[in-house]
Amino acid sequence: DQYIPYRDLFGGVLNEFHLFDRLYGLPEVDEAGLNQWLRIMQLDHKTSFVDGRFTNIDLSTGQKARLALIIALLEDKPVYVLDEWAAPQDPEFRQYFYEVILADLKEAGKTVFVVSHDDRYYHIPDRILKMEYGQVVDIETAS
């Protein structure tokens, strides 16, 4: 087969997601690598990953979204879709996400679709797709 099923290409965090203290559906997970992601996402003071479990998942909405993103990134997909992911983040982490994390994902060769209404960061993406009523009405390319 020369075609890859589309589900193998995409990962993401959509508006509704569920967290569990264990990881399901992932092959062997490197605890040190996962704990490094917790540091990057500024969650290492709230939880850690020990013996195949998160020590705490009683987190704020923004922190839960960060943990969900870490889990999605562990799948190592080439394309990610993040639906209003940054909305529940505090202002400092939201800026860090747009300016650092997205740049790191781009450098790693990942394609990331970020659904956002936050125009403070519209200068960051390579392209902006404007949509109205579910239809693309304009595509802007970074200058």
PLM region spans:
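Conserved "ABC signature" C-loop
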Residues: 12-54
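GG-anchored amphipathic helix commonly corresponding to the ABC/SMC/Rad50 NBD signature/C-loop
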Residues: 61-82, 96-98
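ABC nucleotide-binding domain signature
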Residues: 4-15, 113
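Conserved ABC ATPase signature
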Residues: 53-63
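Conserved hydrophobic alpha-helix in the ABC-type ATPase nucleotide-binding domain
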Residues: 6, 96-101
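Walker B catalytic motif
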Residues: 82-90
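H-loop (His-switch) and adjacent beta-strand-loop-beta switch element
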Residues: 117, 124-142
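Conserved catalytic loops of ABC-family nucleotide-binding domains
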Residues: 101-118, 122
